[in-house]
Amino acid sequence: MKTSQNKSFLTCKDYTVSGENFELIYNDHQDILITQPQPSPEDLPKYYQSEDYISHTDASKKFSDKLYQGVKNVMLQKKVKLINSLVNSENKSLLDIGAGTGDFLKTAKQKNWKVRGVEPNSAARKLAKEKEIHLVEDISLISPEEKFDVISLWHVLEHIPDLDLQIEKFHSLLNRNGYLIIAVPNFKSYDASYYQEFWAAYDVPRHLWHFSKEGMVRLLESHQFLFQKTLPLVFDSFYVSLLSEKYKTGKSNFLKAFRVGMKSNLKAKRTNEYSSLIYVFKKA
């Protein structure tokens, strides 16, 4: 990724695993934030070794976990409805990157999608296998001859180290007129500005990149994708605010988190700066 006119934006703490501090550097050319220092590929897996890393488990121990799992079940249907609206054919194919425990692919498979998935975490792959969803560890294990109608990344792009290279790979794996769907946090949302360094969606150092709408569109258009639309993830502001309250105060202040999450969504009705956004791109 090219860098120019970089300046310090925030210092954030890893509240999930290490307790280490990381700098967020603003790149004005790309209109994104970059986590510094970025862990090496060898060190990165250790920052995911936590029972709190919910996307690699099906656990529902804490209230926030139960909230996450409950919302996830609602969103699975909405996600499949979205991909069905984009592709109208008998032999439709889907590749999900960072497939976690395979629930999205399982739901899509039930709606007659031919599904493939990539998930580096072995425990998550094992849980997916129990649902009869077989995932590969790395995208390099997907044959270049395989082509897909949709490639999806649900809160995954921000985790990928070699960003430009991987986006080129997605482009090559898509069918002509195929779609790339990306969901990521939005650092220009109200809840991000309210919580500042305590905003849970910064999630350093697992989140290596932090996107604005302008930055995301600029990045993907530079890789021969055509921007189609954004869609809001309205539940994210509540879940992220709940975690952020815990980081900021040490307490789970449900009422305060609800108020901040609601205010973020109400402001976003005017600005479209939701806590997280789904981007739909078409292969050019």
How would you name each of these model-derived features?
Residues 2-8, 213-231, 256:
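A SAM-dependent methyltransferase catalytic signature shared across enzymes that methylate proteins
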